[in-house]
Design a protein with these regions (language model features):
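Classical eukaryotic N-terminal signal peptides for Sec-dependent ER targeting/secretion
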Residues: 1-11
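Cysteine endopeptidase catalytic domains of the caspase/legumain-like
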Residues: 16-388
Length: 388
């Protein structure tokens, strides 16, 4: 019987040696600071996302421009940007227009599958509030103290901003409601003021209008990626009409933008170059342009969610201190900084009161294998030598 016990002990000891051989003795623990650097090296360094969506047209025959804007509004909301961080500027004269055969609705497709206007929209500037002055004041935050916070672009140096314009334009200008124009230099200077006032980390500027590319040619501020629907002396075209509505319901450039984005989820790793690949002449019927010289990252490294989505909070386990620390936090509301302050005060209270945090050790599969083998050896030895 003792021979059997001895054999059992030897087998257990062999299992212990095999398990020990699998262990990498040179394994290295990466601390939280290094982990944060690894994460930030491959992603944008922004901490919050905003969207400015503007339809500069009015009147019934410009139905498609409002549909363009509401379509992108629906997309960025689906991707995670909250209404509190979306500024929507519309003439808002389509849904309740007496010519509308479907009162209170706006569609972007002839199948009328989605009512863009009925999806709990929040219009920040409507009707005659959609002016060049208000648009520039919005970008530069030049308001008096009584201006509502809900109608301000409350960005900072860590903000990624998606700016979308659609309407009627020409060579280096875009019309606002057939009453005034914003020029390419006006837009460029507004972006420069934003940069000087540290109001953005990166900007993605998209414009869908005739001769759209001329509107981004004068921009000179860094970290701005631009795309337009047509080059100089080219028109931008609508995609199709709805015979029941009686007018065109969406433009070609925005249609193919949405067609691609509808396949993208909020946690997707799809990059911007994949979207740009959709802007072919066969699709758009014009020559879209992309300006990347002011942008510091390659478009094949820029995630669509860097601008169309909302960055999420990442929490890493500090192995050394045993404390959960927020490495990259994107506030979902104005209470985020208050929560951080409360957390610091709470930790200070624990420290002053003599409390100590104990590191929780998570057993790996290899460690579990070793523990099992050691236990088996111990039991085998006890079984072998404990009996007379």
């Amino acid at each position: 019987m003792k021979i059997f016990h001895l054999c059992w002990t030897l087998v257990s000891l062999f299992s212990l040696l095999v398990a020990a051989d699998d262990i990498n003795l040179e394994s290295k623990v990466v601390d939280t600071e290094d982990a944060a650097k690894i994460i930030q090296a491959s992603t944008s360094s922004h901490t919050n996302n905003w969207a400015v969506l503007v339809s500069t047209s009015r009147f019934w025959f410009n139905y498609r421009h409002m549909a363009n804007t509401l379509s992108l509004y629906r997309t960025v909301k689906r991707m995670g940007i909250p209404d509190s961080q979306i500024i929507l500027m519309l003439a808002d004269d389509i849904a309740c227009n007496p010519r509308n055969a479907f009162p209170g609705t706006v569609f972007n497709n002839m199948d009328q599958a989605i009512d863009l206007y009925g999806d709990d929209i929040e219009v920040d500037y409507r009707g005659y509030e959609v002016t060049v002055e208000n648009f520039i004041r919005l970008l530069t935050d030049r308001w008096d103290e009584n201006h509502p916070r809900s109608k301000r672009l409350l960005t900072d140096e860590n903000s990624n901003i998606f700016v979308y314009l659609t309407g009627h334009g020409g060579n280096e200008f875009l019309k606002f409601q057939d009453a005034e124009e914003i020029g390419a230099y006006d837009l460029a200077h507004a972006f420069q003021q934003m940069y000087s006032k540290k109001r953005y980390n990166e900007i993605f500027f998209m414009i869908d209008t005739c001769q759209a590319n001329t509107m981004y040619e004068k921009i000179y501020s860094p970290n701005i990626l631009s795309v337009g629907s047509s080059r100089i002396d080219e028109s931008s075209y609508s995609h199709h009409s709805d015979m029941d509505v009686g007018v065109a319901v969406i433009d070609r450039f925005t249609y193919y933008t949405l067609d691609f984005l509808e396949k993208v989820e909020k946690n997707s790793n799809v990059t911007m170059d994949k979207l740009f690949a959709e802007y072919t002449y066969e699709n758009v019927h014009s020559n879209p342009g992309i300006r990347t010289d002011l942008f510091h990252r390659d478009v094949n490294e820029v995630l669509l969610t860097d601008f169309f989505g909302n960055v999420q909070e990442v929490i890493l386990d500090d192995v050394e201190n045993g404390v959960l620390e927020t490495i990259s936090s994107v506030p979902q509301s104005s209470k985020a900084s208050d929560n951080a302050t409360h957390y610091e005060a709470l930790m200070a209270t624990y420290s002053d009161g003599g409390y100590k945090t104990k590191q929780l050790h998570h057993v790996t599969k290899k460690e579990a294998k070793i523990i099992t083998a050691v236990s088996a050896v111990a039991l085998g030895l006890l079984w072998t030598f404990a009996k007379p």
